[in-house]
C-alpha cells in the first residue's frame, strides 16, 4: 500500500531525529495534496505537530482558489495552515528559477520563525526522471545528474519522501479516497522545457523511464562510493576558511583531484562566502577552472564573490556592494547578517543597527582601526574584506566592528561568528 511505502521512506530519511514539529509544502496539485494526507497520518501516529505551507506566486487566476482549498483541507485535519505570497514585481525574466528560489525563501523563513527544522516536499519518481533529462540536456556533470532525497536550504532540511513513488500511484490514492485536487494549466504548456520532456516520456515505452531510473541509481552509487569521499578529502586538505568570511584554496593540493570534484569545491566556497543558497552554474565556474590551469595570477568576480589567484593559492571573499543586505535593527540578543555572520550583543544597547562600512565611515575612523592581523591573514587584501564585514551603528555612528575588536566605547560589547548556511562537518575555520 502507498502509506506503508511512504512511512518506510520518511522514517528512513528522518531517522532518530526526535522531531516535535514538521512542515509540508502543499500547492493544491495532486502530488502535494496526496503528500499532505500521507504526512497527516504519519504525524498523528508519531504525535508530531504538522504545519501546512502554501505559496501563491500570483501568476494564475486559479492560484488563490488553490490556496483556499488547501486551507480548507488543513482546517478539516486540524492542522495549522500558512498562506505566503511571492512578489514577482512584474519581472518575468527567468521567472521559473526566481519563483522557485522565492518560494523556498518564504517557506524556510517561516520554518525558522516557528522552530520547524524539516520541510516535506512532494517531489516524486517522475519528477526525478524529468530532472535527470533536463540536466542531461544541459551537459551537467556527475554531481548535477545525481539526485538526493535530503537537501538543505536556509538551514532547513528539505525531505522528499515520495522519491520512489510514481505520480500515477498518488493520483490513484486520491481517486480511491474521493479527494479532489487542482490541475495547473501551465503544466500542459509547451512554453516550458520540462513539459515537453514530460510529454515525450509519456509517449515513450515504459522501459525508457526504467532505464533512466537505473542510470540515476548507478550515478548515485558512484557518487557515494567515489566522488563524495574524494570531495570530503579535498575540502579537508586544500581549503582554509577564516572567521572573517574569506577562504583560501591551496592550488597545488587542488590540482590532484578530479574535475568533477574541483567544480564542487569552487561551488562549495562560493556558496559559503557569498551567503547565497544556490550554487553557480557550471558554465560560470568553468572559466575559473581554465584560468587556474594557466598558472597566472588573476582577479574575477563570480556569484557575489571576488576570486583572486595569488601564486599557488586562490583567495575568495565577498564582493562589496553585491546585494549586501540593508541595515538590520538588532532587536533580539542575536541576529544573522548577510546569511554569513551571527552577531550577538552581550548587553542591552538602544537602537543598534547592523550594516556594512561605508567609505564615509571608514574615513572617519580609519586611524583608529588595527587591521594588522586581517592584513597578514588575507595577503594584504584587508581593505576589500573590511568593507564586507558587519559593523554596529547607533544614530549613524560606528560603535563597533567586532571582527577587528574596534569599539567606540569599552562598554559596548558584541560578539560575531562566521555562520554560513552551508557548513559541513569537514569544514574547518581558521
Curated annotation (Swiss-Prot):
Top-rank taxon: Bacteria
Disulfide bonds: none
One Gene Ontology term from the biological process aspect of the record: tRNA modification
Entry GO MF terms: ATP binding; tRNA(Ile)-lysidine synthase activity
Enzyme Commission code(s) on record: 6.3.4.19
Catalytic activities: cytidine(34) in tRNA(Ile2) + L-lysine + ATP = lysidine(34) in tRNA(Ile2) + AMP + diphosphate + H(+)
Chain ranges passing through the membrane: none
Keyword ATP-binding applies: yes
SUPFAM superfamilies associated with the record: Adenine nucleotide alpha hydrolases-like
GO cellular component: cytoplasm
Binding residue positions for ATP: 27-32
UniProt KW keywords: ATP-binding, Cytoplasm, Ligase, Nucleotide-binding, tRNA processing
Enzyme category, top tier: ligase
Compartments it resides in: Cytoplasm
Protein role: Ligates lysine onto the cytidine present at position 34 of the AUA codon-specific tRNA(Ile) that contains the anticodon CAU, in an ATP-dependent manner. Cytidine is converted to lysidine, thus changing the amino acid specificity of the tRNA from methionine to isoleucine.
Free-text note on domains in this protein's UniProt record: The N-terminal region contains the highly conserved SGGXDS motif, predicted to be a P-loop motif involved in ATP binding.
Family per record: Belongs to the tRNA(Ile)-lysidine synthase family.
UniProt cross-references to NCBIfam families, sorted A to Z: lysidine_TilS_N (TIGR02432)
Protein name (database record): tRNA(Ile)-lysidine synthase
Amino acid at each position: 500500500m502507498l502509506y506503508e511505502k511512504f512511512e518506510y521512506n520518511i522514517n528512513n530519511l528522518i531517522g532518530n531525529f526526535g522531531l516535535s514539529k514538521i512542515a509540508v509544502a502543499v500547492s493544491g496539485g495532486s502530488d502535494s495534496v496526496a503528500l499532505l494526507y500521507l504526512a497527516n497520518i504519519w504525524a498523528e501516529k508519531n504525535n508530531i505537530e504538522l504545519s501546512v505551507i502554501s505559496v501563491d506566486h500570483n501568476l494564475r487566476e486559479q492560484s488563490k482558489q488553490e490556496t483556499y482549498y488547501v486551507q480548507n483541507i488543513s482546517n478539516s485535519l486540524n492542522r495549522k495552515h500558512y498562506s505566503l505570497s511571492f512578489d514577482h514585481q512584474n519581472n518575468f525574466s527567468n521567472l521559473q528559477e526566481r519563483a522557485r528560489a522565492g518560494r523556498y525563501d518564504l517557506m524556510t523563513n517561516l520554518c525558522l520563525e516557528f522552530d520547524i527544522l524539516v520541510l516535506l516536499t512532494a517531489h516524486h519518481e517522475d519528477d526525478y526522471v524529468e530532472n535527470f533529462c533536463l540536466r542531461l540536456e544541459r551537459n551537467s556533470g556527475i554531481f548535477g545528474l545525481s539526485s538526493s532525497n535530503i537537501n538543505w536550504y536556509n538551514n532547513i532540511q528539505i525531505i522528499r519522501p515520495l522519491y520512489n513513488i510514481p505520480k500515477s500511484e498518488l493520483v490513484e490514492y486520491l481517486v480511491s479516497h474521493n479527494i479532489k485536487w487542482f490541475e495547473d494549466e501551465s503544466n500542459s504548456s509547451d512554453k516550458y522545457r520540462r513539459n515537453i520532456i514530460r510529454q515525450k516520456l509519456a509517449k515513450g515505452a515504459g522501459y525508457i523511464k526504467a532505464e533512466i531510473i537505473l542510470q540515476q541509481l548507478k550515478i548515485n552509487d558512484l557518487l557515494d562510493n567515489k566522488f563524495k569521499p574524494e570531495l570530503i578529502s579535498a575540502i579537508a586538505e586544500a581549503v582554509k576558511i577564516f572567521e572573517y568570511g574569506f577562504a583560501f584554496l591551496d592550488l597545488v593540493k587542488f590540482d590532484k583531484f578530479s574535475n568533477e570534484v574541483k567544480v564542487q569545491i569552487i561551488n562549495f566556497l562560493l556558496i559559503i562566502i557569498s551567503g547565497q543558497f544556490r550554487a553557480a552554474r557550471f558554465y560560470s565556474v568553468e572559466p575559473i577552472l581554465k584560468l587556474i590551469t594557466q598558472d597566472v595570477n588573476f582577479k574575477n568576480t563570480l556569484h557575489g564573490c571576488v576570486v583572486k589567484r595569488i601564486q599557488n593559492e586562490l583567495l575568495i571573499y565577498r564582493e562589496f556592494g553585491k546585494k549586501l543586505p540593508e541595515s538590520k535593527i538588532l532587536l533580539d540578543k542575536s541576529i544573522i547578517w548577510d546569511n554569513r555572520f551571527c552577531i550577538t550583543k552581550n548587553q542591552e544597547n538602544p537602537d543598534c543597527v547592523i550594516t556594512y562600512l561605508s567609505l564615509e565611515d571608514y574615513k572617519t575612523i580609519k586611524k583608529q582601526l588595527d587591521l594588522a592581523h586581517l592584513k597578514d591573514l588575507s595577503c594584504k587584501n584587508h581593505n576589500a574584506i573590511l568593507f564586507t564585514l558587519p559593523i554596529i551603528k547607533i544614530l549613524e555612528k560606528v560603535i563597533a566592528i567586532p571582527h577587528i575588536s574596534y569599539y567606540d566605547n569599552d562598554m559596548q560589547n558584541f560578539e560575531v561568528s562566521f555562520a554560513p548556511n552551508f557548513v559541513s562537518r569537514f569544514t574547518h575555520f581558521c
